[in-house]
Curated annotation (Swiss-Prot):
Its main location: secreted. PROSITE patterns: LIPOCALIN. It comes from Mus musculus. Keywords: Behavior, Disulfide bond, Pheromone-binding, Secreted, Signal, Transport. The lineage of its organism: Eukaryota, Metazoa, Chordata, Craniata, Vertebrata. Disulfide bonds join C82-C175. One of its GO terms (molecular function) is small molecule binding. This is Major urinary protein 5.
Amino acid sequence: MKLLLLLCLELTLVYVHAEEASSEGQNLNVEKINGKWFSILLASDKREKIEEHGTMRVFVEHIDVLENSLAFKFHTVIDEECTEIYLVADKTEKAGEYSVTYDGFNTFTILKTDYDNYIMFHLINKKDEENFQLMELFGREPDLSSDIKEKFAKLCEEHGIVRENIIDLSNANRCLQARE
């Protein structure tokens, strides 16, 4: 009987540890996303936006959680040089949604995170009467497991983004040398 109780306790602890959060759910603790991140995968239904020289091909360095907003420090490659970009995204009236102006008007949500390893974003960009989707997978380390990458790919498909439009940045020039 003691062994059975111990097994139940262990399974409960494993379940609690493996629990994921999203900004659409009630269990997101946004404070826990504060800190250093690396861009791992980018996906879009407009692939040219995330290819080399695409306006949305940015590489995250840090997320700062502010009172009613999130501040992002990104890098991008312009004329073969790494350039810093600082963006502040404000909470919208919709629960779990943020907005920021960059190459158009963007709204985004956090689809999934486990805080310690990865975070997945879904963004909708509106510019000049046109819309496109962007999805991002960030990791706390420069690369992530194939299981997490597959989970991201399935989420992309659920949002109508084909696998051919997912770019793995783990071997790309992500301006790592420009990080502090």
